[in-house]
Amino acid sequence: MSTTDDTHNTLSAGKCPFHQGGHDRSAGAGTASRDWWPNQLRVDLLNQHSNRSNPLGEDFDYRKEFSKLDYSALKGDLKALLTDSQPWWPADWGSYVGLFIRMAWHGAGTYRSIDGRGGAGRGQQRFAPLNSWPDNVSLDKARRLLWPIKQKYGQKISWADLFILAGNVALENSGFRTFGFGAGREDVWEPDLDVNWGDEKAWLTHRHPEALAKAPLGATEMGLIYVNPEGPDHSGEPLSAAAAIRATFGNMGMNDEETVALIAGGHTLGKTHGAAAASHVGADPEAAPIEAQGLGWASSYGSGVGADAITSGLEVVWTQTPTQWSNYFFENLFKYEWVQTRSPAGAIQFEAVDAPDIIPDPFDPSKKRKPTMLVTDLTLRFDPEFEKISRRFLNDPQAFNEAFARAWFKLTHRDMGPKARYIGPEVPKEDLIWQDPLPQPLYQPTQEDIINLKAAIAASGLSVSEMVSVAWASASTFRGGDKRGGANGARLALAPQRDWDVNAVAARVLPVLEALQKTTNKASLADIIVLAGVVGIEQAAAAAGVSISVPFAPGRVDARQDQTDIEMFSLLEPIADGFRNYRARLDVSTTESLLIDKAQQLTLTAPEMTVLVGGMRVLGTNFDGSQNGVFTDRPGVLSTDFFANLLDMRYEWKPTDDANELFEGRDRLTGEVKYTATRADLVFGSNSVLRALAEVYACSDAHEKFVKDFVAAWVKVMNLDRFDLL
């Protein structure tokens, strides 16, 4: 583990003064805007992962490249690698099984269900901060071991897919039968900036489980994937870790059975490494010197590798066959008396005091040791609920195998979204509830059907505001992090979404559209909801003097209630949706920051967010029908009035509540209140970046561009979950 003392500094008193004391003239050096204004709005989050950072170009099609892959040969190469021990990082017992399982586990384990961010889906373990987290010590070596294989197969396999597949092959090579593997994870080329890893400034700062439940964080300590293996705050108490384990695994959407299976399964193979104190360990990859070439944690203890390796500081081997699958974890857990001890590095762990020396040494076949366990392993024996599950798995190894296979598949695929995104020959046929399954299409509407449906919607008596609002309510649940939500499935008509306060419009509009769907029987309700938005926007554009056809791709289906996990879908309920001027809680960030958060989840750029907010305001789509931000005298017309009036210096804005959430815009001459607004409205005039964008649409020549840009951004949101079109 690295400390502040480990940070490498190339400057010293004896060096050339140019390199020592001269002004840094490099791009990006010097005091930055955020140094002066640390609360500056993070509009830059909407510019992540653009084509400018992608060396493969916007025409690269990963699914197409993957189809050219010799999948069997790749798995064969991975299997061979497992026992191809390298002298620069020798394999324990001659096998990298445990190392590759840990690499896959720690890549996927950053996922959190509360906001859908994290996970293995984009290969983020290659970048900071994850590449240098204390919990990821030595995984830099695992990735380097994979490099020759990645180099051989090139872009036919992404790093993100390769990390998880390597873990699967490791399990299979140990004799375990996995549930399957779905490829389809596309690499990105820079760190995710939108993931909130926490506010702590020091590694391994403890978080109370109750606090963890209120935040979108996946670990109980900064820099860990899950929990401190020595117990909360190094307590050494197995029972004290139970709440932390439930909190962190629960934040991933795992129940108690899945949690027990994952902990036990992950600790059936491999070992931890703690040959000596952490003071021997050098800088992490991000802080290591340039000649280290991205490798970190160089150890000065002995050879620094093999028997002398230091990773977590714990020195634990759980089972008698650490490279072969078994039920020894549970057998040892319940068979022996466990006594607290310390590793050579000083970390708290447990040893089976009454066990014979039955554990093989990883490098000396003539040596044996007693079984050892982590503090958190013993939680599975001493917590009453975990203990029941553990004993069942002890007595029924097949039940354990099945539970781990399914939990591992869920762990490694949870952030991939619907099954339609999976590719490859090992995709399981079974639909799983956490995949948000969808039925097969019942309708294939023709162009004539669509024309007739649009006419029926237009004649239904619904207003532009209602039609646009219901379509947005359906589609805007999408989360780019784990690809959940969206309009496909029409889950707006099901629990829990139909009853959300933000979706009040559904109670008025859905009965009309449901009746129309039953009468015509030509399209799914999901398609009709989106088509209603099309009709509303085309009417609003025509009223503004612009004739435009809003693109519409039919083919959505209607999910059933039994295909909808109410608890998991409840996590999609927004705290705020600035596009609809909705804010449920004032104790979570600022309104404008939550608007950025929502836009980022919808994969919108800053210009797309800007044009959508401006358009939706003049169309009157506020969730509660309020006039906040409706800066127009002609609501329902797709005009640029929002921008023109927001930037008009005739109006002076002042807050009307103590929280500074609501504002009045008064005529500077008469004092008359002309408009009301929220922070989600005024930010487009106050933030310098967003104001620059608003000015584009406020110009006299922007009307037609505004309509076209609005339609393009709108269609993007409506189709975010159309993975069937890939």
From Swiss-Prot:
There is a cross-link at Y226-M252 (Tryptophyl-tyrosyl-methioninium (Tyr-Met) (with W-105)). InterPro entries: Catalase_peroxidase, Haem_peroxidase, Haem_peroxidase_sf, Peroxidases_AS, Peroxidases_heam-ligand_BS. Binds 1 heme b (iron(II)-protoporphyrin IX) group per dimer. Gene3D superfamilies: 1.10.520.10, Peroxidase, domain 2. One of its GO terms (biological process) is hydrogen peroxide catabolic process. Its cofactor is heme b. GO terms for cellular component: cytosol. PROSITE patterns: PEROXIDASE_1 (PS00435), PEROXIDASE_2 (PS00436), PEROXIDASE_4 (PS50873). Residues 1-33 are annotated as: Disordered. GO terms for molecular function: catalase activity; heme binding; metal ion binding. The active site is at H106. The record marks R102 as: Transition state stabilizer. Belongs to the peroxidase family. Peroxidase/catalase subfamily. PANTHER family: CATALASE-PEROXIDASE (PTHR30555:SF0), HYDROPEROXIDASE I, BIFUNCTIONAL CATALASE-PEROXIDASE (PTHR30555). This is Catalase-peroxidase.
